[in-house]
């Protein structure tokens, strides 16, 4: 018999999943790993790291993955380690003491909607500033014991991971997240099955799973459409953040707003205030309107209720940041909603148009948000002013400076962004009440009592830590991208750990002007190669995959950094994420920001640097316009010299070079006998003491309650009391005014000849009288004298508004009279403005009927 060389059948493999069995002694670790409280508490991350430092790094500093990968033998050893157990018990006791505090019942409850959340680098559901802000906000809501929940998406791929080709071309890599290895929990229904939210998309439903992220005490609920219940066209709705075409964007915004509200309803969650963090979430108010109408209210009554409890925060003045949808596309998915709300299709479209009735105008989410939210705010004082101008067309008859649009300047979550070294300094020298009283400048001023040496050495230690990281990571990415190994040695040798280190890291959009530093390469080369004043620049940031200009900027910087005169002096670090950001904002000496004013809404990366004794050097835009103090940082003038942007760029670049050469570098290198710069340390201390207390997330959260949440919750409660009596009353009053508005008649006017001829003298008081037939509205009309003039910049603005008083009433006839005068001579325009008045309105723009007459 001939023997075969081999003989085997095909194995009948069976897939098995081996889950790590955590010993009972270590169950506390599992509980803490599934609450991202650990992300801003060093004691917790230090504990996880101590279990296995090598594996902690390999696990990407993700405690869920760490516990999964620990061998059973290792787990058994840890369970018997008394030192580890004692440390675990101590951290867990702090965790439970934190978690067991009940929410503050004296503050309104809030539902917070946002497209992205930057909570930890482990959870890739963020791209940049908007998400980081939302993540910080959730954390501070937890720390401040606020009754809040977040609504967002669990992205399968999230935002892209960035790598760079050797020529500097950005490469976008989308890596799928393994949901089973994330600090999240699937939400189950009453039957113990995965909860599913069925979201109507006109002729069919999209089905979304619900996940929960425990952000300390605050829950964040995330929707996920990547499941077999959905078609291949709808599964990708939650694949990528800001990915796909406009149709997918609309699908995302329907899911976030409408799906988010349906999810809260299914979870049994009802809040006092609904906060749309950007226009992406605006459609939540469509679902809310449907719910109230279907419960028995008219559309107008429902609108009063919804508006009174809605807040819209706008984050950008840049047009690309506001979503517009063609009527055909919008109708494809939203066509069924007008009937549910008791309105026509055109009425729904008009709610998203600046010019109602203009069929050529697309539906704008930002406009819809403004029309359905009682309050609107920007994210810094200047951005609030810019937003007033940007949205002024929505409330015709009122000028930007009269707008109700407010602002809350962004802050940052101190425990997340302050390096442990600085937390140690503050903990040692600041009052024990510091963490609960972060806006108290008196506490921050205790930095002046810290020795100069301690401040300098803390900064130096963090810089050296960053330099070590750069050398390691830059070498790794250089070789990964097949760079010349011999050249990397030369480059790393040129990195000077004692040189002044300036950081520039942010989204690479053209208005952020990353190119500004490279306007004059010869002058820049002299600066970076001055042996007496060595300086290095670190760049990092991603450009949107569809932003060719932004990617071009990255490529240009990388190309310049490879030139011999800039080698090791200009460094671009790839894949800017939260982990890298924490290293940069704590490790550099100066944080530079050079946006085109006034396009930087806030720019909170500089605030993060501020918490770490890093000095800001920025354009007076966003938060820095408010934050800058002489002797506590550097600023480019807010004055715009040239309207032609390239000329302004050249001037700003020259200013940057001059400040570096004449002020910044000489100050940094003015060393005393102890080896540090007293002037530099003084600037650090001024920055921390005078600026930092005003830019914490604690202050931001408190501002939202003071300026918006409490006001809205109080008014909303008044409107819904006694079966919505007040809401019905206001809606009926508005309907009556609207029905009679065009019939209101100015019967007669009395004004002196000077006013008629337009020859008015300053300082002289003039009287005007109007008799108005209000057509039965019973003193529901107000009239005022409005004077306009041109300011120093040549822009027309309001000079004065003089209310006219009712001095006589006979039936429907109301006599209005006012005395007014001009303090200044010059050219003015005067007109009379009629408007509906009602003390129950939150502001004039709430019912924007205006008639001008002369």
Regions found by a protein language model. Give the residues of each.
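Catalytic cores of carbohydrate-active enzymes across secretory and cytosolic contexts
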Residues: 1-854
């Amino acid at each position: 018999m001939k023997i075969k060389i081999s003989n085997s059948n095909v194995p009948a493999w069976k897939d098995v999943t081996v889950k790590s069995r955590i010993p009972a002694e270590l169950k506390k670790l599992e509980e803490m790993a599934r609450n991202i409280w650990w992300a801003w508490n060093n004691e917790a991350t230090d504990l996880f790291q101590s279990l296995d430092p090598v594996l902690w790094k390999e696990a990407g500093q993700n405690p869920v993955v760490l516990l999964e990968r620990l061998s059973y033998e290792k787990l058994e050893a840890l369970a018997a380690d008394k030192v580890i157990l004692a440390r675990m018990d101590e951290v867990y006791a702090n965790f439970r003491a934190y978690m067991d505090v009940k929410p503050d019942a004296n503050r309104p409850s809030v539902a917070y909607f946002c497209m992205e959340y930057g909570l930890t680098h482990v959870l890739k559901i963020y791209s940049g500033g908007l998400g980081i802000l939302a993540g910080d906000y959730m954390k501070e809501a937890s720390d401040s014991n606020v009754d809040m929940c977040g609504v967002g998406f669990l992205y399968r791929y999230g935002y892209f991971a960035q790598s760079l080709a050797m020529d500097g071309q950005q490469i976008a890599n989308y890596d799928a997240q393994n949901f089973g290895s994330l600090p999240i929990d699937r939400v189950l229904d009453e039957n113990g099955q995965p909860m599913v939210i069925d979201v109507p998309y006109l002729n069919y439903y999209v089905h979304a799973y619900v996940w929960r992220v425990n952000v300390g005490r605050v829950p964040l609920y995330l929707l996920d459409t990547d499941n077999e219940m959905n078609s291949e066209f709808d599964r990708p709705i939650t694949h990528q953040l800001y990915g796909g075409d406009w149709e997918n964007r609309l699908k995302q915004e329907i899911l976030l707003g409408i799906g988010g509200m349906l999810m809260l309803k299914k979870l049994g969650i009802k809040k006092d205030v609904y906060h749309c963090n950007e226009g992406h979430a605006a459609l939540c108010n469509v679902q809310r309107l449907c719910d109230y109408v279907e419960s028995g209210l008219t559309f107008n009554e429902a609108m009063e209720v919804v508006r009174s409890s809605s807040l819209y925060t706008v984050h950008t003045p840049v047009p690309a940041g506001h979503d517009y949808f063609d009527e055909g596309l919008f109708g494809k998915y939203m066509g069924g909603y007008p009937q549910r709300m008791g309105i026509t299709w055109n009425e729904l479209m008009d709610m998203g148009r600046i010019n109602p009735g203009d069929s050529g105008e697309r539906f704008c989410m930002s406009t819809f948000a403004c029309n359905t939210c009682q309050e609107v705010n920007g994210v810094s004082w200047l951005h609030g002013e810019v937003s007033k101008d940007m949205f002024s067309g929505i409330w015709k008859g009122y000028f930007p400076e009269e707008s109700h649009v407010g602002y809350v300047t962004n802050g940052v979550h101190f425990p997340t962004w302050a390096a442990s070294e600085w937390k140690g300094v503050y903990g040692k020298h600041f009052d024990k009440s510091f963490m609960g009283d972060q806006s108290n400048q008196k506490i921050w001023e205790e930095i002046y009592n810290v020795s100069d040496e301690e401040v300098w050495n803390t900064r130096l230690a963090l810089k050296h830590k960053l330099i070590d990281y750069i050398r390691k990571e830059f070498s790794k990415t250089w070789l990964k991208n097949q760079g010349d190994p011999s050249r990397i040695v030369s480059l790393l040798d040129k990195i000077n750990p004692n040189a002044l280190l300036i950081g520039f890291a942010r989204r690479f959009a053209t208005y952020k002007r990353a190119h500004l530093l490279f306007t004059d390469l010869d002058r820049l080369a002299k600066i970076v190669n001055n042996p007496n004043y060595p300086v290095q620049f670190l760049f990092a940031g991603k450009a949107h995959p569809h932003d060719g200009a932004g990617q071009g900027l990255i490529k240009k910087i990388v190309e310049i950094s490879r030139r011999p005169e800039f080698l090791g002096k200009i460094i671009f670090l790839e894949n800017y994420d939260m982990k890298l950001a924490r290293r940069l904002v704590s490790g550099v000496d100066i944080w530079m920001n050079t946006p085109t004013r006034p396009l930087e809404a806030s720019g909170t990366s500089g605030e993060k640097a501020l918490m770490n004794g890093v000095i800001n050097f920025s354009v007076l835009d966003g938060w820095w316009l408010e934050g800058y103090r002489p002797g506590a940082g550097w600023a480019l003038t807010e004055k715009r010299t040239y309207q032609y942007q390239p000329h302004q760029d050249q001037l700003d670049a020259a200013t940057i070079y001059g400040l570096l050469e004449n002020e910044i570098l000489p100050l940094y290198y003015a060393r005393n006998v102890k080896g540090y710069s007293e002037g530099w340390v003084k600037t650090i201390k001024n920055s921390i003491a005078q600026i930092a207390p005003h830019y914490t997330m604690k202050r931001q959260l408190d501002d939202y309650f003071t300026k918006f949440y409490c006001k809205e919750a109080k008014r909303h409660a008044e409107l819904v009391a006694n079966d919505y009596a007040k809401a019905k009353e206001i809606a009926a009053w508005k309907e009556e005014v609207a029905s009679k508005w065009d019939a209101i008649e100015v019967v007669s006017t009395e004004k002196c000849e000077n006013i008629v001829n337009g020859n008015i003298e300053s300082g002289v008081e003039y009287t005007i009288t109007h008799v108005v037939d209000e057509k039965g509205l019973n003193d529901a009309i107000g009239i005022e004298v409005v004077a306009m003039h041109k300011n120093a910049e040549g822009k027309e603005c309001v000079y004065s508004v003089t209310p006219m008083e009712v001095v006589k009433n006979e039936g429907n006839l109301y006599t209005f009279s006012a005395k007014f005068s001009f303090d200044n001579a010059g050219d003015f325009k005067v007109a009379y403005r009629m408007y509906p008045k009602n003390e129950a309105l939150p502001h004039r723009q709430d019912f924007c009927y205006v008639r001008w007459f002369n």
